[in-house]
Amino acid sequence: MTEQVLARGEEIFRLIPQRPPMVMVDVLYSADETGGRTGLTVSPANVFCINGFLAEPGLIEHSAQSAAAFAGYRYFLAGEDPHVGLIGEIKTFRIARTPKTGEKLKTNVNVIGEAMGMSLVETETFSGDEKIAGGQIKIFIV
């Protein structure tokens, strides 16, 4: 069964403020009031790829941009441009392994709480059925 797609490719630029070469999300599968699901195909041209693998900072940035894509979709529905978000804290983030180029990642974003321009999200990144990374990220929206 094919998964629903809300935005992909260039459409993502309506949802996140990042631009190449710093774009770490290439598809938004779903978004609702509690979270969303994004994807990234790891490309050898990715700035975080080293020796055929997406380095740890790339996985963290992908998770943060996944949260940004979810938030950006809400802004898009309200007729607004995406807002800039800054990583305020990375908490309990675990990386089981780094993915190889060509792997297709899917990341679930669950909003734990929001207040005064700050969002606390829990992310889980999968390659197929294997959870390869995840944790909590605090993001400040400016």
How would you name each of these model-derived features?
Residues M1-A7:
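Polybasic, low-complexity association/targeting segments
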Residues R19-A55:
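Catalytic strand-loop segment that frames the active site of acyl-thioester-processing enzymes
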